[in-house]
Amino acid sequence: MKGHEFRRACHNIGGEFIQISPASKNCINIMEIRKNDKTVEDVIDGERAERSELSAKIQRLHIFFSLLIPDMTHEERQLLDEALIQTYAGKGITHQNESLYGETGSYKTMPVLGDLYDVLKKSTETRRMANILNRLVHGSASTFNQQTNVRLDNKYIVLDISELTGDLLTVGMFLALDYVWDKAKEDRTQEKAIFIDEVWQLIGASSNRLAAEFVLEIFKIIRGYGGAAICATQDINDFLSLDDGKYGKGIINNSKTKIVLNLEDEEAQRVQHILNLSDTEIMNITHFARGNGLILTNNNTVTVEFKASGLETEMITTDREQLREMIRRKQE
């Protein structure tokens, strides 16, 4: 969410900063079926029975639309499924993976949200969904109605969704994570890490089970793709708010290392129960100064002080006084 806070560090280490917002020119096409390089998998595991790439994409799209239209009925979900299949068929794409390729051997041009909108608006039964989708097609968020125009080839990438608000925030967060997850699965021999700030947006009460299951699945299986998943949240209550904390606890249980910073008394008590911390450790957590924390890993707990170098501080600080001092030095 606070991607702009990573901008300085990203630029200083030669990373790629990608802003996703209605005002940005950057776009990730949620309808895009991305080409997977399965060369490594075939070498390691041998050839396997192919799955339908279209079916896999439509499953993800159902999560996207469940966030965009939270009150979607069972009937509308079925009608949406049919509309999605029809939309891809309009581009010559079917459940047969061979249909993804054009005459030149590259993937065909993918549909965009506007193509789905045109299908939905034809029927009175799906017009409500079309009306809601219209904002992303012809309205203030129409930048989402384009082909993907960003690339994830850099070693360090920040996807900034901080300018998205309201219901678009959760939708945008899923959009970015869906794209990153596809990239992470490309090659199991390459190390990678996914950092998700304010993950409660996708696993908390403002989200739903489909999106939360998607996030939890990443934490469960990313090690099998040679990667790591790291998340952060400032509100443990939001983190544990959906389905009695099922997804938040699932992420914690699938995380080898946990870092706990300063917490209020109520939140500290919840953490104590989940992480089996002692009363002394909880007392420390509620009195931690800025920069102090508790690390839990391999059944060990260690109290630490995180110290950044001068350069690191300049790249990541959000402290107002430090920012003023940086401005003063640069203006001299």
Locations of regions flagged by a protein language model:
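P-loop NTPase motor domains
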Residues: H4-S24, N29-G227, G245, N284, ...
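Active-site-proximal loop/turn and secondary-structure-junction residues that shape catalytic pockets
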Residues: E163, W200, D235-N237, D265
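Short hydrophobic alpha-helical runs that function as membrane-insertion/retention elements
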Residues: E16-I20, A228-A232, K258-N262
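C-terminal regions of RecA-like/P-loop NTPase motor modules
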Residues: D187, F239-E332
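Sensor-1/coupling segment of RecA-like P-loop NTPase cores
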Residues: I222-F239
